[in-house]
Amino acid sequence: MENEQPVIPVQARFNSIKAFFVLLVRQFNEDGCRQSAAALTYTTLFAIVPVMTVSFVVLSSVPALQGKSAQLQEWAFEYFVPSAGNMLLDHLQSFAKQATNLTVLGIVFLVVTSVLMLSTVEQTLNRIWKVQTPRKGLVSLLMYWALLSLGPICLGLGLAITSYLTSQAIFSDTVSYLGGVRLWLAVLPFLFTTAMLTLMYTVVPNTTVPFRQGVLGAAMAALLFELAKGAFTFFIKQAPSYQVVYGAFAAVPVFLLWIYISWTIVLGGAELVRALVVFQEHQRQVPRMHALVRLLNVFWQRQQSGKVLRSKEIRQVMQESGISQWDEFRNLLVNANLIRRTDEGGYILSRDLRNISLGQLVAMLPWPAHTQLRVRQQPESLPWEQALKSRMDEAREGMMAPLDISLDALFSAPSAEKERHPEQQGRND
């Protein structure tokens, strides 16, 4: 049959799923997500009042939401915080209302505190995506302000829809055609949480994050958040002894613990997004060393013609190797002073490849030896790639002499220039 699809053996599918979760757990541990969640917990403790104050200001600027700040915060706490932390809401609202009476200098301090929290979140997500250069200047401030503005507005929209559905359930049968008010009241907060996390996962990191994987990771994090909230509430109800120990301050450690759990879930979702991207690319990509030398070859060609390689072109070059690897490669090559960024935003070689041998390149890289020396042979491999594989195979057998060749000499293998997409060279020239 022409329409028959190849059947993936159950064992192969199981091994693939197992490898994915191994990758996810390894990334979570290597990126220090638990330590980052702890740091964000304390940052949140200091920034929660400024963020609530900013939400007061944002909501008061929207005519339809004026006077709804207290109701919105109660609704947000009811959804996002287990019942054990609700007793803190009155105190936080009191602090936030008092903060609205501050002077201009005090308001600037609150805004700066809120921005610093978002900056910490950006740094954490950039570390997950292996990005070393955060956004700077006006672009960064605009993104932070957009997040501070959209968050309260999205919550306000959720509150408005919830109120509308509740009123429709009382006065008409409209909601029954849509599946019932209880179903929608349960689903809507989940959808808004997914939307906000999608915004965080795809917009905050200073790199290109695929939207589809961002939505999948956000939905999974929102689901885990719901499960964790139920489990946490059940635990608190079944183990009330903490109230005997802490007394009137019992809500504080419980609230801190919940913030830590929430940030752990959020960062776990970010790791899931990256794992989805990396694992999908890993299924079809060439080995990292091969991909890196390919990228250097493109830089070398541009150097020969005196041209700059732009980020958009680099991502096109790395489409087969895996776009997500560009951030790691850029960091490695910049730190090794092999490439540098131009004022126009492109990248060029900063060293003469005649003075750098293949062995020196291998020594610069932090990857394990078995990873560095792997090169994939393909039917369309260019002459220099065939020479690279031959030399790497000999090096894997313990003979390091084949690596004593400059990168310039490697790329100048016979017929290499003729074989490399002559139509593209014609356009570049």
UniProtKB/Swiss-Prot annotation:
Coiled coil: none annotated. It is a multi-pass membrane protein. GO terms for cellular component: plasma membrane. The keyword NAD does not apply. InterPro entries: UPF0761_bac, Virul_fac_BrkB. Signal peptide: none annotated. Keywords: Cell inner membrane, Cell membrane, Membrane, Transmembrane, Transmembrane helix. The chain crosses the membrane at residues 45-65, 102-122, 141-161, 184-204, 216-236, 256-278. It is found in: Cell inner membrane. Pfam families: Virul_fac_BrkB. Its main location: membrane. Belongs to the UPF0761 family. This is UPF0761 membrane protein ABO_1543. It comes from Alcanivorax borkumensis (strain ATCC 700651 / DSM 11573 / NCIMB 13689 / SK2).
